[in-house]
Design a protein with these regions (language model features):
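Beta-rich accessory regions
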Residues: 133-309
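Catalytic core of carbohydrate-active enzymes
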Residues: 1-207, 213-214
């Protein structure tokens, strides 16, 4: 039918990839009494945090469930409130910049295969890349990095109570994002040949340098939409990955616009006309004015307006 079976399969696979994140969250519940799932008002003292009852925190990620049917244009509308800050949808990579102190209310559009799950700037999200249903500590880890300042400690343990902690410290300054990695604990419980795929989710055209124990080393650059490098993990040695974005914030905004316009179902001539108008915009304000005044369908305009959320 509509592909819901395949979508469910993908989310079940993603849940398995989340095990490092979920296991660490369970450890925090045990050690610090911090729940995995929390209402927004646990973290944000705002009237909106109480009014938007469907939204919740999932290990620090903001989740906005889809509670209404999709419309004929293929999108569901989700009314959301976001606190002040910068957020990235972990599935669609859409970015949202909230500058007002009291946060901002708005509407997000999503197709059947996705729901809004937003990582705040500074988030570090560990995922397993191992295949199969093994519950062993993963040999291959993917570390998703969302530009900003933050800290995350990955927790792993063994069958006899051994523990291992990997500190992941993220800083952003002077146009570069730096991820520091250092592990401590019983190294016998982690795989000897562990590799880390590090994905800088907000850098689309960038360069990276990797330092191991203060010495620069070669790293394997992988060709994904965003800047991605692979490094071999070494216990007891600090790893630093320094990433630089070669594009400005407005250039990244234009990149998102191009992606939305490519996917939009519009009359080809109208679509081409406004696409050419948009790419000539000199700044974000002008781009927003052009979108509002365009002849595009309301669903396309609403999707484009998410760029300025």
């Amino acid at each position: 039918g509509n592909g819901t079976g395949l979508i469910a399969e993908e989310f079940l696979r993603f849940r398995h990839r989340l095990i490092p994140f979920l296991y660490t969250a369970n450890y925090l519940t045990h050690a610090q009494g911090k729940p995995l799932v929390e209402p927004l008002y646990y973290e944000y003292a705002s009237e909106e945090a109480y009014r938007y009852r469907d939204e919740y925190l999932f290990g620090g990620l903001i989740v906005a469930p889809v509670t209404s049917p999709i419309k004929e244009d293929g999108y569901a509308r989700i009314n959301v409130w976001l606190p002040k800050g910068k957020y990235t949808d972990i599935f669609t990579k859409e970015e949202y910049f909230i500058e007002t102190a009291g946060g901002k209310e708005g509407v997000l559009l999503r197709k059947l295969e996705s729901i809004p799950v937003l990582a705040k700037a500074g988030t570090v999200l560990p995922l397993s890349l191992d295949n199969g249903n093994s519950v062993k500590n993963p040999e291959k880890l993917e570390i998703k990095v969302y530009s900003g300042n933050g800290r995350y400690t990955l927790y792993e343990d063994g069958e006899n109570g051994e523990e291992y902690f990997t500190d992941l410290v993220l800083t952003e300054s002077g146009g570069q994002v730096v991820l520091g990695i250092f592990g401590h604990g019983d190294a016998g419980i982690i795989p000897r040949n562990r590799t880390l795929r590090i994905c800088f989710e907000n850098i689309y055209d960038g360069v990276a340098e990797v330092y191991c124990g203060g010495k620069r080393i070669d790293c394997g650059k992988e060709y994904f939409v965003n800047l991605t490098v692979t490094v071999n993990y070494e216990h007891g040695t600090e790893i630093r990955v320094v990433a630089k974005d070669r594009k400005t914030a407005f250039e990244n905004m234009l990149y998102r616009m191009k992606k939305i316009m490519t996917e939009a179902e519009e009359d080809v001539f109208i679509k081409d006309k406004w696409y050419n108008e948009f790419i000539r915009a000199e700044n974000a304000c002008k781009l927003e004015e052009l979108i509002v005044s365009s002849e595009l369908k309301e669903v396309t305009k609403t999707k484009l307006k998410e760029i300025f959320f």
